[in-house]
């Protein structure tokens, strides 16, 4: 295993926002995502809430990023992570990591998810904290061989699956306990009424 900088194994690109006062730039067919659309339950994002037009792309000189790109919110808030399921555009609240052949995007996804506090500590700015492209490029990651990355991701996926299953089971148990208590209350009220 070797330690490398993200900038050595990923191309890091930022997004841009087309002018919001140009209606011909909006409500098109192209995905344009913002950090507000990401949450902890999302691994792969396939659609954005807002869409832009081809005219917006041309006039604003927007750069798309391909499916498989790791999206990292770089401000407001720092540290939301997802993987693009298809080609997308985004606002400037992201630093997008286009993975080289040396790094598996889901391995990078899990790495970044585990480093939210660290990423926030790297934030700079008075009004709101932001991490720059240079900061992201210089983040170091332990990088095993790609085959090992796949194994690690497989194990992490299984752990997440088990946690999700246990959470569902706990929710059902909680509902059962609540319904049992409600049933007891109903029975005791009926006994009083009789």
Model segments located where?
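Non-catalytic DNA-recognition/assembly elements of restriction-modification systems
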Residues: 1-16, 138-146, 150-153, 165-194
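A short glycine-rich beta-alpha junction/loop motif
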Residues: 74-77, 88-95, 125-147
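Active-site/binding-pocket entry motifs
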Residues: 38-39, 77, 118
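Generic alpha-helical structural context detector
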Residues: 7, 11, 31-34, 95, ...
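Low-complexity, Lys/Gly-biased intrinsically disordered segments
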Residues: 1-41, 56-60, 189-194
């Amino acid at each position: 295993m070797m330690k490398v900088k993200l900038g050595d194994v990923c191309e890091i690109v930022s997004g841009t926002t087309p002018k919001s006062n140009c209606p011909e730039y909006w409500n098109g067919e192209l995905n344009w995502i913002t950090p507000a659309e990401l949450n902890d339950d999302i691994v792969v994002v396939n659609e954005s809430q807002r869409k832009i037009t081809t005219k917006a792309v041309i006039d604003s000189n927007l750069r798309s990023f391909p499916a498989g790109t790791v999206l990292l919110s770089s401000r407001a808030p720092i540290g939301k992570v997802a993987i693009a399921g298809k080609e997308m555009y985004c606002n400037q609240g992201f630093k997008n990591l286009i993975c080289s052949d040396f790094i598996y995007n889901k391995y990078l996804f899990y790495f970044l998810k585990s480093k939210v506090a660290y990423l926030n500590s790297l934030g700079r700015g008075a009004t709101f904290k932001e991490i720059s492209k240079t900061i992201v490029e210089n983040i170091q990651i332990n990088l095993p061989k790609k085959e090992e990355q796949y194994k690690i991701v497989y194990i992490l996926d299984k752990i997440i699956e088990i946690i999700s299953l246990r959470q569902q089971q706990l929710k059902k148990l909680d509902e059962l306990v609540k319904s049992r208590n409600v049933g007891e209350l109903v029975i005791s009220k009926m006994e009083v009424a009789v």
